[in-house]
């Protein structure tokens, strides 16, 4: 807490992360409620539960891409603006309760969650560069606490907004967009402080599919060594449990 109060850049990054994470979590529970309100609610709720897990599959790849991103400061800012636009787009189409619209909203939610993981990876090198090594553990711990707080608070706020607006899903999506935009504006105002260690990345001719396969193979090897089970089987179990729960 002392680091948050005394270190201006860490405070800015933390506030931005809190707003961005809250924006990511606000719509999670609300989306399940929206799915349950559709005429095809059984398949809709099933899909809504599935898409909350799918971004996990891209976590390692997104983390690597975040490390390789050269303009981390600028990228964090524009990604937040993109997420804001995505939810404004949701707000404009969510009134139409058909399957095509619902499938489109599912894809937007997946993209937004993946982008949230990406921005989290972009913030980390900035923290590492600007905070002394002996304070990094405190910074990481407080960052995890903020993520946990934004998870609980974001979903609770989403339900409250939905209740007070009499299930106006478009209104909640607009509020969600506002959180992402505010997160980016905070960083834009302090963009000159967002310094980090520059990275040099060699141009690779490996395709996206090949990179994903290589990352998955490495993850599966590590998982088998530690758990003696297949990563794919464990993911399928998690998906089924999440859907049934």
Model segments located where?
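Substrate-agnostic recognition of the 12-TM MFS/MFS-like secondary transporter fold
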Residues: 12-28, 50-64, 73-83, 104-163, ...
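Short helix-capping/hinge motifs at transmembrane helix termini and TM-loop junctions
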Residues: 40, 93-98, 162, 166, ...
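Small-residue hotspots at the loop-to-helix junctions and early N-terminal turns
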Residues: 40-49, 141
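Helix-loop interface residues and adjacent transmembrane-helix termini in multi-pass membrane transporters
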Residues: 7, 38-39, 68-69, 130-133, ...
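C-terminal ends and interior cores of transmembrane alpha-helices
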Residues: 81-99
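Short amphipathic helix-loop junctions that connect adjacent transmembrane helices
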Residues: 29-43
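Helix-loop junctions on the cytosolic side of multi-pass membrane transporters
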Residues: 173, 178-204
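Juxtamembrane intracellular "pre-TM" segments in multi-pass secondary transporters
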Residues: 1-10, 193-235
